[in-house]
Amino acid sequence: MEEEYGDRIRLHWRAFPLIPDEKPGRLATEKTQEGRRRVAAEEPRARFAPPAVGSGLPASSMPALVAAKCAERQSDAAFRRLHDSLFLAQFGDNLDIAQPELLWRLARESGLDMARFEQDYAAGDAYQVALTDYAEGTAWFGVSAVPAVIFNEKVSLVGAVPVERYRAILDWILAGEPGGLVPIPPDEAAAGATLPDAK
């Protein structure tokens, strides 16, 4: 979408920990597999590889979110490189992104200033920044799952939805929000689908 819309849109990533507390021993289930298969079918460019049933899952999402916040302090580009690496590691390669060794390797491979990254990570305040993102998302916008996208602090899409919904909302916003009603792509309107009302 960023490539398609260029500088007409600006994307700002916020942290939303799916597993804020440590939960060791998490294992992939058939539901995990099916969820990843569904997302992969929706967006073929995304690398979603279903994990084997019974394989390990990250014990917490916080270490990776903290690492991403530390990268963001270096630059938006540094954040995007690490974010993309973390995403691919977890969803494409089924690696445990809660493991410090993997986080450090991905940070190095993403070209981060490692001295600064290690200092920021050890300082601990990036953890609080990630929790603040989470609190704001739930309190202000009712976010309860990912992916969640908030458009102009008015409309939210939560969960894996077809890319056409994103386009419809972006086009509506860029056109000045005509009619005050959030649009529904024609094929979904015929099926009776609805989008959340503008807030």
PLM regions with names:
Residues 1-91, 99:
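Structural alpha/beta surface segment adjacent to cysteine/selenocysteine redox centers
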